[in-house]
Design a protein with these regions (language model features):
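Long, low-complexity regulatory segments enriched in Ser/Thr/Pro/Gly and acidic residues
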Residues: 1-146
Length: 146
């Protein structure tokens, strides 16, 4: 699989992680219907809901998203999620390669608290993802109530 070492992917990753940049997500897709070359498809500032609207039901795509949430009135947390999107209309051979290829993408987007496997846009519900991040972070101040 090639294309993951592209400088625009590294720059987008750095932008999502930066506290000084408004970019909150990036999306990586296959460059064409055949072959294994990956490319940066898009970035955005609108969080999880905007990212979900950009996913393609006929593709496997990988995303990296910044999630900010408050545990209480005085603390704000910033965490990152890695999203593996397998659209409902994705070809079988693309689906079959996800387990191998996702590990290569994770090497390029290494720092994340959770991995979200999604095949419906509803799987990217911000409240559910925040609950998972709280549990993964070990600082769930809501007594298990999410």
């Amino acid at each position: 699989m090639s294309g993951l070492d592209a400088p625009e992917i590294a720059a987008a990753y750095d932008a999502v992680r930066s506290d000084k940049d408004e970019t909150s997500w990036l999306l990586i897709s296959y460059a064409s219907a055949v072959g294994n070359k990956m490319t940066l498809t898009k970035t955005g500032t609108g969080g999880i809901s905007e990212l979900a609207s950009e996913l393609d039901d006929s593709q496997v795509q990988y995303a990296y998203v910044r999630v900010e949430y408050a545990n209480d009135v005085e603390s704000k947390r910033v965490k990152f999620a890695f999203v593996i999107w397998i659209g409902q209309n994705t070809k079988i051979m693309r689906k079959a390669r996800v387990s191998i290829e996702s590990s290569e993408v994770k090497r390029v987007l290494p720092h994340h608290s959770i991995t979200v496997n999604a095949d419906h846009k509803g799987d990217l519900d911000e409240d559910d993802i925040v609950k998972r991040l709280r549990k993964a972070g070990g600082a769930d101040y809501n007594g298990g109530r999410g």
